[in-house]
Amino acid sequence: MGKASKKSVAVAVAPAAVPAKGKGGKKREAEDEIEKAVSAKKQKAAAAPPAKAVPAPKADAKKAKKQPPPKKAASSSSGSSSEEDSSESEEEVKVQVKKTTKPVKQESSSDESSDESSDDEDAKPADPVANNGLKKGKPASSDSESDSDDEMDEDEKPAAPVKKTSVTAQKKKDDSDSSESESDESDSDEDVPTKSKAPAVAAKNDDSTDGSESESDSEDEDAAPKGAAKKESSSDEEDDSSEESSDDEPKQPQQKKAQEESSEESSEEDSDEEDEKLAKTPKKKTPAATKSQNDEPKTPASNQSQGTESATLFMGNLSFNLNQDQVKEFFQEVGEVISVRLATHEDGSSRGFGHVQFASSEEAKKALELHGCDLDGRPVRLDLAHERGAYTPHSRNDTGSFQKQNRGSSQSIFVKGFDSSLEESKIRESLEGHFADCGEITRVSVPMDRETGASKGIAYIDFKDQASFSKALELSGSDLGGYNLYVDEAKPKGDSRDGGGRRGGRSGDRFGGRSGDRFGGRSGGRFGGRDGGRRGGRGGRDGGRRGGRGGFQSRQSAGTASTGKKTTFGDE
């Protein structure tokens, strides 16, 4: 009885003395009241058909599997309890339910064990559970999935402290149950909550409902596990939600990290591209600087050539009887003629060309207007004389010059006509003395014949400057020791473009050799000269005219010139 008074004080219920009638009350009156309560519960059940939820039996089955010992204890205790005890407990529960419906919202302590509160809770979560099953398609998959909507309903009521104060609520329930049942039943109920928090509520509600032995008690059994399932589902879903939130939280930093890495990579690529551009720009600027240096104003080649244009004209297609006085008379109307040089052969005959020098280049250009005019019965050909280095050998300038394009290729002169019977040293001395007045001589070459050791009758003289070279050319036809010298510009070796021989004149060889050779050599050849010969002599005054045996007999002699051993092959 003392326990019942404690219960009434804790729940703040005034008529707590109702169960004091105890076991000495009338049995008939208790049975009548039970029947009235059963009929009232049936009416409530009929008025609220949505309270039948499909997942409720499954939850009961799960809890029956999880906690078989509490149910066994409940069944044993219910068997030992009397009908009077169950009736008295039912009356006491009814009184408490009517006056403690409001505290149920604060904490699920005593109303979870009552019948009406279980019915109310059964009616409320029925629809959310059904909706949850339709939405997710998994009505019986797990506690967190089937009871997720139940947790939302309990969240409207302050359900957070339920988890913390479950132990105290269970103790209060134990006290109330002990006053309603025997001492053994209360002991078995007190052992169950120590093992688990939420399932203990379901076990205690089962103990109270089994003792009633009525159909209303079965409905209470369905409602009580639902309340426990709500608590379990709330705790499970809180854990799941916390895990999901914890799982979602690292995803966001990972995405941020990926974005930061991508941004860093893009920034690095941009910086690399900028570095490459910076590295390339100096390379582009460097050639520009060199170009600016190379693009410095320079005097064009044409201007240079014009600045050093010669005042000398080349005359071609001249009459062989033309003299210097006739040339001066021809050009006296154009300007002042300083000198006239007519090229001659070794015998003094004219070669048909010459040079005329004027006082200025303007006068020389003006004299070009007389090109094609008749001079001593022939149309004269006029052209500006090329200064040394002002043209490319073997090429013609824009004026269509017809003079020898190899002229001016060097500052060397070719000399022949001197006494070739003298020794090499004496020939050298005589030539140096004869051309000393022209200018400084840098080299004198007198080729010698290897077989005879005598001079070939030719010599080459190099001068230091162009002026000396030009003066030396004027000495062509001059006398040296009783011999008339022939002076001309030296040609490179192998140049035999001019017919009539390099120095052979009218008696030259067939292919332009200097002394009658086949391809312009100095010492004759197989088909040299007009009178030919195998060697063509040493280049006398008239070229290869004094050649050897001549004719085409040289072919036969050339065939027998070999000195090797003769080999014959017999028919054997």
Swiss-Prot record:
Compositionally skewed regions (Basic and acidic residues) per UniProt: 27-38, 488-520, 528-545
Q: Which InterPro entries match?
A: NUCL_RRM2, Nucleotide-bd_a/b_plait_sf, RBD_domain_sf, RRM_dom
Q: Show the ranges annotated as biased composition (Acidic residues).
A: 82-91, 109-122, 144-156, 177-191, 208-222, 235-247, 261-276
Q: Does the keyword RNA-binding apply?
A: yes
Q: Which GO terms describe its molecular function?
A: ribosomal small subunit binding; RNA strand annealing activity; RNA strand-exchange activity
List the subcellular locations. Answer: Nucleus, Nucleolus
For bias kind Low complexity, which ranges apply?
Answer: 7-21, 45-58, 72-81
- GO biological-process terms attached to the record: eukaryotic translation initiation factor 4F complex assembly; formation of translation preinitiation complex; rRNA processing
Q: GO cellular-component terms in the record? A: nucleolus
Q: What are the disulphide bonds in this sequence? A: none
What this protein is called in its record is: Nucleolin 1
Native source species: Oryza sativa subsp. japonica
